[in-house]
Curated annotation (Swiss-Prot):
Organism of provenance: Uperoleia inundata
Highest taxon in the source lineage: Eukaryota
Chief place of localization: secreted
Subcellular locations according to the entry: Secreted
Protein name per its UniProtKB record: Uperin-6.1
GO (cellular component) term, any one: extracellular region
Length: 30
């Protein structure tokens, strides 16, 4: 349903945010 779609979208957003932060720690430019 809608709640599931929103929830999974938020999870993906959180994951990409974590990946960005991790990359920053490692010194990647993006």
């Amino acid at each position: 349903g809608l709640a599931g779609a929103i929830s999974s979208a938020l999870d993906k957003l959180k994951q990409s945010q974590l990946i960005k932060n991790y990359a920053k720690k490692l010194g990647y430019p993006r």
